[in-house]
Amino acid sequence: SELLTPLVNGLAPHVDLWLAETQSSIAEARAIHAGLPKDGKPFWLSFTLKDEDTDEVPRLRSGEPVADAAEAAAQLGVQVLLFNCSQPEVIGAAIDAARATFERLGAAIQIGAYANAFPPQPKEATANDGLDPLRDDLDPPGYLHWAADWQARGASHLGGCCGIGPEHIAV
């Protein structure tokens, strides 16, 4: 709240919607939501996913199941739930889990995705400890393959995160 309040107060007169981006846990999303003004502006929420050691259940970086995150998003009144800054390979299952949760709840929440182009990060990696290479297979046609899959699974908002540029979006 000490860090969030001045940011929100400064941005409030200038934004059309609120986006809590690259959240790694449900608690983070709830904390951001609690710090937003009750101004009627749409609230979009984007989670980052666990890329490594995945089991059959898509998970946030915190280890929480995406289905639980989707249920929390519905409770928070989110208009769009997105998945970003993750490997494209894990996003499809997250979309499926979110869509199934929203259908079960009868929630009309849109879904979106925007992956990054970095190779998988080791568990011991730290933020900003160097430059990451970009994956060769995620050139514009390679990224289009993933975006088409996400759209087929029900994503209506598509974009790109780190390493995905305008040339990717143009295709």
Positions of predicted regions on the chain:
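Domain-level signal for soluble alpha/beta catalytic cores
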Residues: 1-171
